[in-house]
Amino acid sequence: LALGASPIMAHAEEEVETLAAHAGCLVLNIGTLSTPWLKSMELAQIAAKKNKRPIVIDPVGAGATELRTHAAQAILEHGGITAIRGNASEIAALAGSGGTTRGVDSTLESDRITQEASTLAKQYDCIVIVSGAKDFVTNGVHTCMMEHGDAWMSRVTGMGCTATALLGAFLAVNEDAFRAAIHATLFMGLAGEWAHKSGLGLGSTKVAFIDVLGDPQEQAFPKILRYSWA
């Protein structure tokens, strides 16, 4: 909402197809996974795919349990995925390289699985975003590495899901999925840095983060961005 998007969280089978068909982007987040929701996600995914809507999956906790790993893999196999965003362990689990997840936290550093992320992007013809101390965005051919953000972001619940929602908002208005993913990831990191400078503690820093999402000021962002290509 702060960014200007208008999200709606729907799980009922009776409405997900209609909503997904008309949404700017469908975000499938398995954070609060339950078996009945899997059918709703499948219906929403089919509708979004049929209507050529971008689809994002956040495989929260993939690698922590078989249910989460298999659910995320099933969503990928259904097809039509535009982007996958997760931490290093979640992406490694989807790539089948044995990543383990501690709750929603990664046990791997993001720069250790760049090859797995690239392979996953090629396999499903999508964009893969690996979040961490360094963020990586790859389309399977080119990879952009960004070094923005702040350590406080890993200490507040929901920041990963926020990054995924932000990605969905950017994809809804930019048909170039690779560019949209890079811009969303950069903006998330830069907003986190600015919030750290403005906040006094974790609570006020999160409020400051929402402030910059709602009213990004030019002075809040550095003139030189820290990124590289591979």
Residue ranges with predicted function:
Residues A93, T157-F187:
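Short, small-residue alpha-helix embedded
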Residues E116-A121, A177-G192, F209-I210:
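Short, well-structured alpha-helical segments that form the helix of a local strand-helix-strand
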Residues L33-P36, G61-T65, F136, M153:
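Short, small-residue-enriched loops and turns at beta-alpha junctions
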Residues A2-K52, I57:
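Active-site cofactor/substrate anionic-group-binding motifs, chiefly glycine-
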Residues L190-A230:
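Charged C-terminal helix
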Residues S118, C144-T157:
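Short pre-catalytic strand/loop immediately N-terminal to key active-site residues, enriched for Gly-Thr
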Residues W37-G86:
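Glycine/small-residue-rich loop that forms an oxyanion/phosphate-binding "nest" at active or ligand-binding sites
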Residues L67-T143:
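Conserved phosphate/ATP/ADP-binding segment of small-molecule kinases
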